[in-house]
């Protein structure tokens, strides 16, 4: 209408050259103009409509927005929404490609099938694969990928099922992308889904040479995996092959693997199964304890030494006192004591502990192929198991008692460092130095290290232990006697004497009767070998005098080269054999003739050495007996002065706590008590005096000795007797000695010990 009026208006306003127009003429003119204007408007509207229709055919803006919605529905696995959208869209929209923001952070052309395969949308995959317009092997995008490539590299939890659906629909497992990679070459799954990776490799076929990845399976959780055959390219395209592969994958057990770094072969690494590295000593005290000195990277599992941050690290059982019992807090990872913990941390500390290592037989025996085995493979490799503790480490009381027995067999007494070093092996140190009867000075000085209290440490010593004899000692041990005897006497006289059971925690240096009573009664009565009633009663007050008298007779027979007859006034003759056997058992000596060279077996390796040592001592004794009293006069006088010294005053108070003699014991017995050989004072010197050993093996027991004045005169004057006794001018031998004679006897005895020492040093 606007055009029509615009065309008519000029007509109405046009002048007629000054001539007026009539009404009829004007009406005719208006009708013609309207018709012309209407025709022109119709033509223009038709052209506009045609242009709009043409634009509608080529316009894709609205169509792209609708296709983006299809890709979103495919990623969300919304199969129902995708079905409704495809019904409104053209049939070809299901296989069209659109822009999708992918993993590489760029827009790539992807079809709804590719997006569904990437995210594992199984319902959408089934819907799209059912449409005839969808091509399962279509390539698109700059990378030329396919739906099978997207499913293999998507890493979705259901990627295996997605690959199975595509293979069942005819997807080509050998199709390559723009880079030449097959779907099997681009498999990508999270580390926790290693079983899915194995299944994808089996479904997509083995990788070709040059594009393969190394697969390492170290251990299986349930059972050993059987090899799974992969179908060929032709069989993989068939639905039957996919169904068979699905069944095989469902039957596969879950596999738990651990990656292990591969190291090149290092010939410089020691073989932990041979030579010294497989010995018990190294395994218990050095394996995974000593730090490794290699600065380069190598296999820790093949190296016997410890490395920084290694879980197999062990604490040295010689420095850290812990037991073989596993620590319950360490298993939970909350042990706060660290290296100070008294329990084992880890498997290596538990089974390589000296108390447990190789105390049991290995179930595989000699066919065991373990790199480090904690068990013995033959009976010869079994380490001894102590009954008292139930482990390979003896109890502190058992070790202390064994030390006393061996010291008694070697002529030593417990309490000196020498006696302990002579019986303990340098390669097997004890677990608890403070609890095995050694002096405190011998323990490791580590104030921050706790003391190990093994189970059974409070138990009594084992009944199965055996006392050592001379034939059980190596020949080299006899050379130690001369070096340690002087230290032994000093320790016995000046050091603190403590009980191995811990009952006597504090003792004075001066020995008094109360200390002696506690020492002998506590140690002997608590011992299992004296646990019966008849022998336990011997230490009652009523039997004390008889026991001390018999003890003096035994010591006199050991020390004095002159056979002296004592009057058994307060000793019951029927109790002598029992007391004698008891005393011999307490000293660890089975019989007086046990250490005689004649009693040593001919097959013993120390036969000749022992015979030579005792023969030399016998020669020294003969030399001593040939000396006259005038040669020993000044020495005896000096010895008498020593007895009156303040040091000897404490010795003179051994008879009773008050210092006065007990009238139940006569003067002679009191003198013998003061001469007790177990606590004799040594005036000086470094070499030992073992003359009592020769007396023990050569002379008969005191019960069978028959001594006469003629035998005494034949021997000659003795330094053990005062001049009034040795020259026959004094009282008889059976008469009791007065105070001066007792002092002279003790002084002469000390002088003889000095002379024995001097002669022994000259002879050696």
Curated annotation (Swiss-Prot):
Coiled coil: none annotated. Residues 616-665, 698-732 are annotated as: Disordered. The keyword Repeat applies. Residues 705-716 have a biased composition (Polar residues). It comes from Oryza sativa subsp. japonica. Disulfide bonds: none annotated. One of its GO terms (biological process) is regulation of gene expression. It comes from the Eukaryota. InterPro entries: Ankyrin_rpt (IPR002110), Ankyrin_rpt-contain_sf (IPR036770), Unkempt-like (IPR045234), Znf_CCCH (IPR000571). SMART domains: ANK, ZnF_C3H1. One of its GO terms (molecular function) is DNA binding. This is Zinc finger CCCH domain-containing protein 24. The keyword Protein biosynthesis does not apply. Residues 640-659 have a biased composition (Low complexity). Keywords: ANK repeat, DNA-binding, Metal-binding, Repeat, Zinc, Zinc-finger. ANK repeats lie at residues 108-138, 143-175.
